[in-house]
Structure formats: C-alpha cells, structure tokens
C-alpha cells in the first residue's frame, strides 16, 4: 500500500477550503474575464473597436466598476495576466477594486492548447514549466485561485484514451502545483459542443472524462476540498437535429456529475460553452431544480454568457459605460438566481441575450 507523505499542512488545507467555499457561497458564481489578447481581438472586432491595451482596460473597467449589487452574486473573478496589473481611471488597481467588494481574485495560468501528435487533431495544454514560481508571484499579487483549461472534442474517433489520460494528468499536475502555493485550482476539462452528437453521447463522454480527471487528482494527492470543477454542461452537439429541454439537459448533467465527482468537491462552476446568455441561465436554473441529490454547489463560471449584452451596449464609447455595466449586473443577478433554482426566465425571445455565442473549435 502506498504511504502518505502529507503534501499540505492542516493550515494550508483550511486556507484552500475556505477560499473555495467563499467563491461558491450560495447564489454566487464566477465572472470569467480571462480572455487572452487574441480572444479580446475577436470580441472587440464584433463591435468595431480596435484591440489595444487601453481599449481592453476600458472594457474590463466596465465590468469591474459594477456596484455592490454584484457582491451577492459574484464570488470570484478570473483575470488574464495583463488585467491583473491594470488600474482603473482613478489609478486604483483592478485587483483592489474586486477585493474591496469581498470578491476573490483568480488568474488564468495555462498557456494554451497544443497538438497531441498521433491523434486526430486532439490537443493537450501547455504551461506547467515555471508554474510554481508564477503561482507564488500571483499569490503575492492578490490571486487566491487559478484556472487551467483542457479541451476535448467528440467525434467518431475522439476523445481518444490517450487524449483523456494526458489531459487528466496535466490538470492534476497543475492542481497539485497550485495547492502547494496556496492557490485553489479550478479544474476545467472542456468537452467542446462541436459536432452532431446527441445528449446521450455527450453524457457518456463527460462521464469517462470526469472519471479520468478524478482518478488523476487522486494519483497526484490533490486535496479535493480545496478545488473547484469547471465542466461543460451535458448538451447535444451544435449540429444535432434533436432539440432538448433544459430539464433533459439538467438530468443528463447532474447524472454525469453524480457518477464521477466526489462529494468532497465544494463546487461545480459550469462553463457556458457558447450558449446564449438566456440559455445558459435557464439551463443552470434547471440543473438547480433537478430532482436528484446534489452534494456540491452547482453554479456558473461564465465569460461570454455574462458579457455579451454588456459588450453590445458599450461599443467602445465612454458615454455607454454606465449602461453597459448595468447590462452586466443584470446578467450576474439572473445567474445568481439560477444558481439557486430561483430564476423564472426573462420571457425575452429576442435581443442580445438570446443570441448564440457559439464559436467553432473555440480556443482562448
């Protein structure tokens, strides 16, 4: 039987567990504002705004200047490296702006996906080199949690056993390194919604991927109470001809989680995966109304699904900043309700909130 060499002290474990629980306190979720410079280029070009460092700062300021209404629905904000060191118009660092609201600051630490040779276009994620040193610095600079994204895709031949195993192991290495530095790792194995597969196929693949991830986390002695999971919801592929209800998506999603995610994990913060703002809220709401026991907080870690209406309202104009911030607050509040199963739906069929945010082969 393997011996246990304690990786973390009782104090370290308590700190990690406390941070994780703060982020997913009832009715709270995560704003993912960690789009890379390249991803911001796509967002800004949609509204005809040049992708400069100053414009990226101004856009992040729209989100981060939200008033105290967001305290009750946002538990954490994921920053990109550049944003972590930017300030608002008054010279106040964004990190302090967020911390002063009692919101936990997080940082994206992976360095993007790279091809896995010998596979059918599958990938792994790079960024383990120097990660411990970067985590130590980020912790000093105010970050208490981190995010690392792995990507898997569903096709006839994928995900392969190799891709599942490699990505599970890289997530576990990342998680272990974060915890050694007092940072809560968000483990993100995203199964892309590309393809014409049905709900059952996505559920099956999600179960296989999550089972591998938690096996790897155990192998690497990761302290589960000090982690969060950021999975896809179980949904059909974007090209699937069958339309499923939020209730069907919720049942498939919660069933997959119940079969694979230990109850020691404090929270599951779903990615929105290109769903429209409204769809992402309705599905999260249905998940929290699902009639199965759910031992974890089930909440959101949304990027596009919290930002699309705000971006549309802003359009790079200073005069629109206030209105854009209001749009963000509205989505944050809606998702805070959905995370408690208390959202009744907007009744809006049109408008920005109903626009699909799907991008094929999405890479940040």
From Swiss-Prot:
Entry-annotated residues carrying N6-acetyllysine: 111
GO BP terms, alphabetized: fructose 1,6-bisphosphate metabolic process; glycolytic process
Catalytic activity as recorded in UniProt: beta-D-fructose 1,6-bisphosphate = D-glyceraldehyde 3-phosphate + dihydroxyacetone phosphate
Alphabetic keyword roster: Acetylation, Glycolysis, Lyase, Phosphoprotein, Schiff base
Modified residues (Phosphotyrosine): 5
EC number: 4.1.2.13
Entries under CDD domains matching the protein: FBP_aldolase_I_a
Site (Necessary for preference for fructose 1,6-bisphosphate over fructose 1-phosphate) residue list: 364
Residues reported in the UniProt entry to bind substrate: 56, 147
Residues annotated as the enzyme's active site: 188 (proton acceptor), 230 (schiff-base intermediate with dihydroxyacetone-p)
Pfam families given in the database record: Glycolytic
Alphabetized GO MF terms: fructose-bisphosphate aldolase activity
Annotated positions of the Phosphoserine modification: 36, 39, 45, 132
Pathway this chain belongs to: Carbohydrate degradation; glycolysis; D-glyceraldehyde 3-phosphate and glycerone phosphate from D-glucose: step 4/4
Signal sequence residues: none
Subunit structure, interactors included: Homotetramer. Interacts with ATP6V1E1.
Misc note: In vertebrates, three forms of this ubiquitous glycolytic enzyme are found, aldolase A in muscle, aldolase B in liver and aldolase C in brain.
PANTHER family per the UniProt record, alphabetical: FRUCTOSE-BISPHOSPHATE ALDOLASE
Family classification: Belongs to the class I fructose-bisphosphate aldolase family.
UniProt name for this protein: Fructose-bisphosphate aldolase C
Gene name, Swiss-Prot/TrEMBL: ALDOC
